[in-house]
Amino acid sequence: MKKIVVAYSGGLDTSVLLSWLKNKYQCEIVAYCADVGQEEELDGLEVKATTTGASKCFIGDLREEFARDYIFPMFQAGAIYEGQYFLGTSIARPCIAKGMVEIALRENADAVAHGATGKGNDQVRFELSAAMLAPKLVVIAPWRMDDFRAEFPGRAEMIAYAEKHNIPVQASAKKPYSMDRNLLHISFEAGMLEDTWFDATAPSARDMYKLSVAPEDAPDQPEYVHLLFENGLCTALKADGTDALLDQFSLKPLAVKDGFTYLSPYGIMKVLNALGGRNGCGRVDMVENRFVGMKSRGVYETPGGSILFAAHRQVESITMDREVMHLRDSLIPKYAALVYNGFWFSPERDALQALVTESQKHVTGEVRLKLYKGNIMAAGRRSAFSLYDEAIATMEKDPTQSYNQNDATGFISLNALRLKASARRASAAL
């Protein structure tokens, strides 16, 4: 082993891991940190990495790529895992893995290393992504190595190691939960949350949340947001206070037209996160089925993603053909499972994405949503490609006479044939 690229955050765990790998393999270590919107302080990270033992440190700004190439295609597919989870952590891992693999190939490294534990899903996501992108790279997972776990059975041993080896980390008191943040969401798990009866909405847990206010603390007046979609992808939005948010996040509009602000996918997510967060939207508490076989409780904040999901569904409702929608809906659990289980880079996900792209070619229009104390309510939808015909749908007299109610008699009779046959068979068996 001559060179290893290590996924690095600058925290205690990855700093110790970096130093330990250098000592174990006696080779060059390159640190890699991906910025996927985790809002961590990255200044000084290169110095910290080289002081710890890395020959160099790369920081990849993947925020726009993450939104454009991962979040938006996934929401275009309507993916949601087990009916609740918007896959915030799951979708970030292939993006990070791709960035790390690209650095490894550029640096002619022999291996990549990550700090994911042997009990979680992330180890699978990182390694399956690497297998598809660069099958010749060796993947090192220290937490699955007996000697690493023996040396570091707990946090105290890591702190002692850092002090002994002059690793520049500031060890803080461990929080009663673990947290993972990116542009799409924040996840909380472990610690106090391992008790499935623990109330994550209780006042004692109030300080845990970072992206959203508690619904009961949200404004007493509803807030409206309009979103424009083109081919199933959100391109623009309109809401009170948008300009202030653009200034706050240093975002430059691509265009401003008819009151709508056109933004890049990254900009869309930043603004929607702020809008949803201040209205208490996007909190989920669930017990999910991990790919590695166990059940795990997670608490998630996905304010912007929740708005995007709801709006996309509304514009689909008037623009998608019924059978195309039902076909796509039947594939959502499979698509979501592929993302959750680490198969973003796979031929089957590519095939599903092609179907999604075809299904979305007329999903273009405007949606109006009402945000109020944690609720996201549809308040209108319209499209030049709408399949909704008010003249046909009306309960009043149809001026077009394109729907003859008498035709329903034959339709019902034909659909009842198999039911009557089943009933006759059941009666004969008595």
Model-based region annotation:
Residues M1-A7, L12-L430:
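Nucleotide-activated chemistry modules centered on ATP-dependent adenylation/adenylyltransferase
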